């Protein structure tokens, strides 16, 4: 019996993971929502512009939320401090870009991308290190204690925001967008911002990379097995503690990447940037299903669609509309679009 379970944990996908691969019904929600929005918006060009903007926004949210959903699913940790990594990553990227003003303002795409790539590398490296320390000092003592997790991680977020005020000041900062990524490409009557195309490419690349790691590597199989049954993985002799740390650090790095993309999208930066986006990130995590990368990806697109469509039609209810979306989906599927765990 142990050998059979071991094969499931380390060499074969758990049954719920295999089962949801063939479930394409939730995917239909994306085109259904888009079609439903068209008559309300009226103008097809405006509708298409909003839809493209939603895809770009969805990719940024996915990058941020993907790490958090694995932390939720594998570690069973309610990390409200995830917003701290979003903000710190964005500020580290800004600090890196400012001395590279010559590269950013150059007309050469290679220099622009080199500056952006270096800023992203610094942001991800910095948030990885901070994430490791955060897990050791704040998360580890409260494993299995959800109320304490909420309190201490929220406290960590507040402390991080205050430290940002100390090191970078409390005023709003400009986030320099490279010259080559400014402006838009016109396709027919639709203007598509260049930067949005980049964010879509980055988001898709992260999604594909995570799928490959989770489905084609031993580490990925262990992570998926840990999401499904942590006790069985430990019984097989694997050190789930190390897996916890690796996943938390990776999630922190992705938050740093997502924070950088989000700040560049806004072209401004404040200490509260993490708090501003973390609500949408948690909605995505809950909608998608704890531990499900596919569900997180789909949930990110749905949330971004709802935010963009309602933001155009009725800006005051944009956030409320996403909460309503979450309620409707949970009434339909209480464990999320693609439930991986039974928790």
Language model: regions and residue ranges:
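Cytosolic-side transmembrane-helix boundaries in multi-pass membrane proteins
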Residues: 1-36, 148, 152, 167, ...
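Alpha-helical transmembrane segments within multi-pass membrane transporters and channels
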Residues: 103-156, 163, 298-303, 333-334
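Membrane-interfacial amphipathic/re-entrant helices at transmembrane-helix boundaries
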Residues: 1-64, 92, 104-118, 145-150, ...
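Peri-membrane helix termini and adjoining interfacial loops of integral membrane proteins
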Residues: 5-6, 99-103, 170-183, 300
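Helix-loop-helix "hairpin" substructures at the membrane interface of multi-pass membrane proteins
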Residues: 191-269, 293-298
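Transmembrane helix-bundle core of multi-pass membrane transporters
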Residues: 137, 141-216, 243-246, 267, ...
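Transmembrane alpha-helical segments in multi-pass inner-membrane proteins
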Residues: 67, 111-112, 116-124, 245-255, ...
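Single transmembrane alpha-helix segments in multi-pass membrane proteins
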Residues: 47-98, 133-147, 282-293
């Amino acid at each position: 019996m142990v050998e059979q379970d071991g094969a499931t944990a380390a060499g074969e996908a758990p049954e719920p993971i295999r089962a949801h691969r063939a479930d394409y019904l939730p995917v239909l929600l994306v085109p259904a929502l888009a079609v439903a929005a068209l008559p309300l918006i009226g103008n097809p060009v405006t509708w298409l512009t909003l839809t493209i903007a939603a895809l770009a926004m969805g990719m940024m949210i996915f990058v941020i939320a993907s790490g958090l959903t694995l932390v939720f699913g594998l570690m069973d940790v309610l990390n409200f401090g995830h917003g701290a990594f979003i903000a710190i990553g964005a500020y580290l990227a800004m600090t890196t870009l400012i001395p590279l003003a010559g590269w950013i303002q150059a007309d050469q795409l290679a220099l622009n991308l080199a500056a952006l790539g270096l800023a992203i590398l610094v942001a991800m490296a910095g948030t990885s290190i901070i994430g490791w320390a955060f897990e050791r000092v704040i998360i580890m003592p409260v494993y299995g204690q959800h109320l304490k997790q909420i309190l201490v991680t929220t406290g960590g977020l507040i402390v991080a925001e205050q430290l940002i005020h100390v090191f970078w000041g409390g005023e709003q900062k400009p986030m320099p967008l490279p010259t080559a990524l400014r402006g838009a490409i016109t396709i027919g009557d639709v203007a598509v911002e260049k930067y949005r195309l980049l964010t879509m490419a980055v988001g898709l690349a992260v999604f594909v990379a995570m799928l490959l790691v989770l489905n084609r590597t031993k580490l990925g199989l262990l992570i998926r097995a840990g999401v499904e049954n942590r006790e069985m993985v430990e019984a097989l002799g694997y050190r789930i503690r190390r897996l916890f740390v690796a996943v938390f650090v990776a999630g922190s790095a992705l938050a740093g990447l997502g924070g950088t993309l989000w700040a560049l999208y806004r072209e401004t930066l404040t200490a509260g940037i993490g708090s501003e986006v973390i609500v949408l990130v948690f909605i995505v995590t809950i909608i998608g299903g704890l531990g499900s990368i596919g569900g997180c990806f789909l949930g990110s697109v749905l949330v971004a669609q709802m935010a963009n469509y309602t933001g155009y039609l009725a800006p005051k209810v944009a956030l409320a509309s996403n909460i309503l979306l979450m309620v409707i989906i949970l009434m339909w599927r209480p464990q999320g679009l693609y439930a991986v765990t039974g928790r």
